[in-house]
Regions:
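N-terminal cationic amphipathic segment used for targeting or macromolecule association
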Residues: 1-2, 161
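Catalytic palm subdomain of template-directed nucleic-acid polymerases
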Residues: 164-166
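Structured core elements
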Residues: 160-162, 271
């Protein structure tokens, strides 16, 4: 028997016609869920990009180091723009050549490398019904000459979403991860990540053995065991859905015991890293990538459908491509 189509009622928050909303919009604590957005691009210096964003969204620019700027009080809240390379940020590194020769050299290098080393625009927590407003920033960057991952053979630029977890319980976290691993081959077919990003391994899939463990409907660990299992299989940030920031937020001591030197920012969010950033493509919008994430959350919220999907995966004899077809039918038919 085929599963009934997913029927998610419209959100009372409204949202935007091109942008779907997840089925769970309020956390276990009763607050509206938010999402952070990060987009990488080249072709503009950090200072130039900050000016572009200020012109489009308002706010006041504050320089935090030669290649990092905050735009305070924009229509999207406080934003950050910086060159995505620690060596060009004297304030972030105690001992490097830039710190020795001064901020003027750091600023010059930031401008000189703007076509090679990407900039990154980062939002703070944004209400999920306002995600569509981020496209205004994308449009402004494109008009100013920003380049996307498709514009250079060595570019590997990503669009990242940091959706707030609906809660701190295993019931708020495991279903989302389970839905994600079961839909991963479908997502990759839809997203078609840039070959350079795949080659450089910025957003690798989860190991096959770990996928089978998480896919099993009988896998129901408590939170501590879940964190231990995750760390044993994934002692790295290099995953297309990075849970280390979330797990660090939930139990920092447990994570640091395994990864004492890993650079991990603690926050109550998933870190979805698979999509490309194609800022320069005419009409490129973050809507399709956001909607694919919402599709994962919708499957996660349907316990019966999720269990059927997991059981089917464990008994599936085919390859990844044919599983993507089967997963799409089971999840969305």
């Amino acid at each position: 028997m085929s599963a009934a189509p997913l029927d998610i009622p419209p959100s009372p928050l409204g949202g935007h016609a091109d942008f779907d909303l997840p089925p769970v919009l309020v956390t276990e604590g009763g607050e509206r869920r938010a999402v952070g957005i990060e987009v990488e691009f080249a072709g503009l210096s950090a200072e130039g990009a900050a000016a572009v964003i200020q012109n489009a969204l308002g706010g006041a620019i504050e320089q935090t180091d030669p290649n990092a700027f905050r735009i305070i009080g924009t229509s999207l809240g406080d934003l950050e723009v910086e060159i995505d390379s620690r060596i060009l940020h004297p304030s972030k590194t105690r001992h490097n050549v830039i710190a020795e020769v001064g901020s003027r050299v750091a600023s010059w290098l930031g401008s000189a490398t703007s076509h090679v080393i990407p900039c990154e625009l980062v939002t703070g927590p944004l209400p999920m019904d306002r995600v569509h407003e981020f496209d205004r920033a994308v449009d402004a960057l494109r008009t100013a000459g920003a380049r996307g991952t498709q514009d250079g053979a060595l570019y590997a630029f990503g669009l990242h979403f940091n959706p707030q977890a609906a809660g701190a319980s295993i019931d708020a976290i495991l279903p989302v991860l389970r839905a994600f691993v079961l839909l991963n081959t479908w997502l990759r077919r839809q997203v078609a990540p840039d070959a350079t990003r795949s080659l450089l391994g910025f957003a690798d899939p989860f190991p096959a053995d770990y996928v089978r463990r998480v896919a099993d409907p009988a896998y129901r660990p408590d939170l501590a065991a879940f964190i231990d299992d995750y760390l044993a299989a994934n002692p790295t940030r290099n995953r297309d859905l990075d849970l280390l920031p979330l797990l660090t937020h939930l139990d920092e001591a447990r994570v640091r015991a395994v990864l004492p030197n890993e650079k991990i920012g603690s926050r109550p969010t998933f870190h979805y890293r698979l999509p490309d950033a194609r800022v320069s493509d005419p009409g490129w919008s973050i809507a399709p990538e956001w909607n694919r994430w919402v599709a994962v959350e919708r499957v996660a919220a349907d316990a019966e459908r999720l269990d059927r999907l997991g059981t089917a995966y464990l008994g599936f004899p085919g390859d990844d491509k044919s599983w993507a077809d089967r997963a799409e039918r089971l999840a969305f038919a």
